[in-house]
Curated annotation (Swiss-Prot):
PROSITE patterns: WD_REPEATS_1, WD_REPEATS_2, WD_REPEATS_REGION. Disulfide bonds: none annotated. Keywords: Repeat, WD repeat. It comes from the Eukaryota. It comes from Aedes aegypti (Yellowfever mosquito). This is WD repeat-containing protein on Y chromosome. SUPFAM superfamilies: DPP6 N-terminal domain-like (SSF82171), WD40 repeat-like (SSF50978). The gene is WDY. The keyword Amino-acid biosynthesis does not apply. Pfam families: WD40 (PF00400). Signal peptide: none annotated. WD repeats lie at residues 122-162, 171-210, 343-382, 386-425, 475-514, 527-568, 615-657, 716-755, 762-801, 845-884.
Length: 1037
């Protein structure tokens, strides 16, 4: 625990960075002597040890973080827990931790049902003449036992089909055991049951047999080809009895299979190849290294060694089967004495090796995975059990942090290697393929994709990388439902429908705490996640309560992720709003009633809930609380009724109807049974946008006022303006309707409905979330279509004598939306006849619904959450700062000061090309686009340019010259440049040249031409030209 780096005095709450091991031991002795310390005593000890002078507010915040028991003393366990959490927060892997499962996307089908089952899948990169390898360009190859080889493009479109039949067998069909691609030589190798190797030329569209290596002692079962521009290409061979051999191809002679004009197929015996009679290649026989069929071979270039594995010999006598046999060998290619042997019970069927970390993983027929240190072969470091059948394929990912293994039943398991735990079990392959057909697999490191073939070829993405040119990533795995800001700890807490609770350090884009599966329930014996729908902090901002869709409430210490208490408002009653007051917790939802859980004697224990008077006739959808005196609570139901409650007594004193806001509705204080109306239609989630809204461009449609009043209106959000006085002339309560309008009420007993304004500019859009600053100067609204709008509220529904003056010039400098435009956008046109409240900004922040908004007054930052699973940070003017959880980093933000104007702002990649002009202007900070010509002016310019080029309105037609005036011969046609085919090793140039036929030349009498030239007289040409100009001048005179 020694301090590695110097203490940063700008963050005095990070004690783990200041205290050394000696300091912690000194504190332990003090706590061991005194048992507990008072705040002042702890402050004195920390000041003496660290030398940091704590301010009163800073130390009070620090003590509240340490004091988990919420008493007046600090215990040793509390201090150690706080230091441990600090070290966990500094873990660099906390940012890289993914919330998604390794295989979270849908499975894709590359090829449908095949005639012959696929036994091997390979990918060949493009190798240029200079030896450079381009993995982004290449082709796929699928092999079958029936010797049918199919070649596919990179997008799995068919290229060609080759048949690797034997030229010697007439009636008996061949059986292919293994195949290998030689991409640097454009050859394809086939190992068959006839104990021979066949090499096919696969240049262009051909599949021609060129060379056969026959008379191999045993059939080859495993092939592996390795090529490099700097070293010799190598092919590792493993046969049926455990022999391993290596064939080397010389780099100075890239034609090991030279064309022989005498024979179409070159044949060579394997004994001649081993004896060195073939000058193009050499073969090294390492003998019988394994006891049985070689299952897999692989070459390790960094160690100049190869790895081979096999199962145990099944023909061993019964009394010797318990004896361990050599199942895996690491053999140096040059130094034969450098050989490492691994003995595994029942043998090894497949392996994965990381040469950088010397890390080896083996899988056997017993279904167990064994982790080895390749330098120690006596005992595995760990054994992972989980497969019920033999493991047939595996690979490592992300620097050996994840291990993927597949068994014979086509079940894929993903393991966390450092923690030795199982992350995920993926069984979709087993249900999509025939169970009796064995499967093969290939992992593409370029696309991070696992391709599995049997009777079909299917693929899944394994931890795919984020395309940063398209998106900044995601913050949650499912839509985000709640977003909270804790000013005490200066963090942001987000809750999602994926049942995740994440604590974010928004200043540095880091995940501090992740609570997975926060709410769960058992359905039909399976543990299922429950969506989180509501959350809030306690008055001291140290604890958090969350509400779920099944009616459950949980109390959390969100810093440590520990659960403290559980409650419920009713079975299968979704919690839509929850508030934590000093007297208790208020929760409401689909139970039609407000439930209060009084605070127990310890301040943490909560007895059973007490229901308030039931006045709502339908499910409660939203609520808002006013914590200024007198405290009040507003709740709204699905039918549009708003009820105002006195928070101290729990009595209702006001009631409104959204469809008829001016009508005075008496509050029913009599306890009577209110029948629940039957729903005529299924409710739609705000997190799932309807498809027909995406398929067409929406326009503003104004419905008649009478038609709007006749229908029941749903209220999506309520908001109290707590900074305004409690007076009937002040608008203190806002309610957003389903029509896109916001109603304004006064929650004073003598007040009521005051007015409304339209807050959207797109048909079908509506305000889902509202928030405001601490002074109620601005109103921030988030809409269903992803727009964020900022309104000036300081002079809206305020008495005329109390309205402050509006400095429009200062607002214009702060909000780029207010700049004058040549053609006003739709957002400005929608409020042209609506002078108040003043629209300060409007821009599209998300592609889908905005589910929550948080405004931080000190830093002037606006944080938005959306159903597109992202949390984005904006400035108050609309500039994009970043996305929480994105791999894109940004400079550390100051939580107490606004962002400087010279900050490197960006535009979200998903909004870069598909937003309106108004949104683009706001995201660019007022910078103008290049003014393009309109379509009419552009077409007129093209028309004038066309007229200048063409003649008489159409292009010239041949012949371009008058043959009577210019009696030339026939004009030869245009010959394009030849296109050479460089896919061959030798380019036949003369076959591509277009040579015209030779014509007979007419003989010319050269002597006659010379005589005529001598008779020409040019002496009087100068006088003739002068006389011509004199006549011309006389004419003009």
């Amino acid at each position: 625990m020694d301090s590695i780096e110097e203490a940063d005095t700008s963050h005095p709450q990070l004690l783990h960075r200041y205290l050394s091991q000696n300091d912690v031991e000194h504190l332990y002795r003090i706590f061991n002597k005194r048992k507990q310390l008072l705040p002042e005593e702890l402050r004195t000890e920390l000041t003496d040890l660290t030398g940091v002078e704590f301010q009163d507010e800073e130390f009070q915040t620090l003590f509240m973080k340490i004091n988990a028991n919420k008493d007046e003393y600090c215990q040793w366990d509390e201090l150690v827990s706080y230091l441990i959490l600090g070290f966990q927060n500094d873990d660099p892997l906390a940012v890289q931790e993914s919330l998604d499962l390794p295989i979270s996307q849908d499975m894709g089908m590359k090829l449908g049902r095949q005639t012959y089952p696929v036994t091997k899948i390979q990918y060949a990169p493009l190798v240029s003449y200079d030896g450079t390898v381009n993995w982004s360009q290449g082709f796929w190859v699928t092999s079958t036992r029936e010797a049918v080889i199919n070649f596919w493009k990179r997008d799995w479109k068919h290229l060609k089909t080759g048949k690797a039949f034997s030229v010697d067998l007439k009636r008996i069909k061949t059986m292919v055991l293994d195949t290998a691609i030689l991409p640097d030589q454009n050859y394809f190798c086939v190992a068959c049951l006839e104990c021979e190797l066949r090499f096919y030329d696969i240049i262009a569209s051909g599949f021609t047999l060129k060379t056969i290596i026959n008379r191999i002692p045993n059939a080859i079962n495993s092939l592996y080809y390795h090529f490099s521009p700097d070293t010799r290409s190598k092919m590792i061979l493993g046969d049926y009895v455990g022999h391993v051999r290596m064939i080397e191809f010389f780099p100075e002679n890239k034609e090991p299979f030279k064309f022989d004009a005498a024979t179409a197929i070159t044949r060579m015996a394997f004994c001649d190849l081993v004896g060195g009679l073939c000058p193009q290649m050499t073969c090294v026989d390492y003998g019988r290294l394994l006891p049985d069929i070689v299952r897999q071979v692989e070459f390790i270039e960094s160690r100049n060694s190869f790895v081979a594995c096999s199962e145990n010999d099944p023909l061993v006598p019964h009394h010797m089967r318990n004896k361990l046999q050599v199942s895996l060998v690491i053999q140096h290619t040059r130094k034969l004495d450098r050989r490492t042997k691994f003995k595994v019970f029942k043998g090894v069927t497949c392996f994965a090796f990381d040469s950088i970390k010397d890390f080896l993983v083996t899988g056997g027929p017993d279904g167990q995975l064994r982790l080895w240190d390749s330098r120690r072969s006596d005992k595995p470091t760990e054994i992972l059990a989980g497969h019920n059948s033999a493991v047939v394929f595996m690979f490592l990912q992300d620097e050996s942090l994840k291990l993927y293994s597949m068994d014979q039943k086509k079940i894929v398991k993903i393991w966390d290697v450092p923690n030795r735990t199982l992350i995920q079990t993926y069984s979709q392959f087993s249900s999509s393929m025939f169970k009796t057909v064995p499967a093969c697999a290939y992992y593409s490191e370029l696309n991070r994709e696992l391709v599995v073939g049997a009777n079909k070829v299917l693929s899944v993405s394994c931890c795919p990388k984020i395309a940063l040119e398209v998106t900044d990533g995601e913050s949650h795995t499912q839509p985000i439902s709640v977003l909270l800001h804790n000013p005490l700890f200066k963090v942001i807490v987000s809750c999602g429908l994926d049942s995740f609770i994440i604590v974010w350090d928004y200043t540095g884009n880091r995940k501090l705490t992740i609570i997975q599966d926060a709410h769960t329930e058992v359905i039909h014996g399976i543990l299922e996640k429950v969506q989180i729908t509501a959350a809030c902090f306690d008055p001291k901002l140290q604890l958090m309560v969350t509400g779920a869709r099944n009616g459950e409430l949980k109390i959390w210490n969100f810093n440590s992720g520990s659960l403290m208490s559980c409650m419920s408002i009713g079975s299968e009653c979704e919690v839509t709003a929850v508030f934590w007051e000093r007297t208790g917790i208020l929760a409401m939802g689909w139970n039609h009633v407000i439930v209060e859980f009084p605070v127990g004697s310890t301040g943490i224990d909560f007895p059973s809930g007490v229901e308030w008077q039931k006045l709502h006739s339908d499910d409660i959808l939203c609520a808002s609380i006013n914590r200024t005196e007198p405290k009040a609570l507003a709740s709204c139901s699905y039918s549009g009724e708003i009820i105002l409650w006195m928070l101290e007594t729990g009595q209702a004193y006001k009631r409104f109807d959204a469809a008829k806001p001016r009508q005075k509705i008496p509050v029913n204080f009599k306890k009577k049974r209110i029948p629940q109306p039957t729903r005529r239609q299924t409710r739609l989630s705000i997190f799932q946008p309807q498809e027909h809204w995406r398929q067409r461009r929406l326009t503003r449609i104004v419905m008649p006022a009478t038609a709007e009043l006749l229908r029941q209106l749903t209220i999506h959000n309520l908001l109290f303006l707590e900074a305004r006085p409690f007076h009937p002339d002040y608008g203190t309560l806002l309610a957003s309707l389903d029509t896109g309008r916001i109603l304004v009420f006064s929650h004073h007993p003598d007040g009521g409905y005051m007015g409304a304004f339209s807050a959207v500019h797109m048909a079908g859009d509506r305000v889902i979330m509202m928030t405001t600053d601490s002074d109620n100067r601005f109103l921030f609204t988030g809409t269903y279509l992803g727009y964020i709008k900022i309104w000036l509220l300081e002079n809206y529904f305020v008495p005329s004598g109390k309205q402050p003056k509006v400095n429009r010039a200062a607002l214009r400098l702060q909000f780029p939306f207010l700049m004058d435009d040549v053609v006003p956008g739709r957002a400005k046109r929608s409020v042209a006849n609506q002078p108040m409240p003043m629209l300060l900004s409007s821009y599209q922040a998300h592609r889908t619904c905005v589910t929550d908004l948080v405004y931080m007054h000190a830093s002037q930052l606006l944080v938005s959450a959306s159903s597109d699973r992202t949390i984005r940070i904006w400035t108050i003017s609309g500039r994009y700062v970043g996305l929480l959880g994105s791999p894109v980093k940004w400079p550390t933000l100051d939580p107490d000061h606004p962002i400087a104007r010279n900050y490197n702002f960006r535009i979200p990649p998903d909004l870069h090309r598909e937003v309106s002009f108004t949104t683009a202007q706001v995201l660019r900070g007022g910078e103008r686009f290049i003014k393009f010509k309109s379509r009419i002016l552009q077409e007129a310019s093209e028309r004038r340019r066309t007229e200048a080029i063409e003649t008489y309105g159409k292009p010239l037609e041949p012949p371009y010259l008058n043959t009577a005036t210019f009696p030339y011969g026939p004009h030869t046609s245009y010959h394009p440049d030849p296109k050479l085919d460089f896919s061959f090793r030798q380019t036949p140039i003369f076959e591509h040249l277009s040579i015209p036929n030779l014509l007979k030349m007419k003989p010319v009498d050269s002597e006659k031409v010379l005589r005529d030239a001598k008779q020409l007289n040019f002496s009087n040409d100068g006088d003739r030209i002068d006389s011509y100009h004199e006549k011309k001048d006389n004419i003009f005179k």
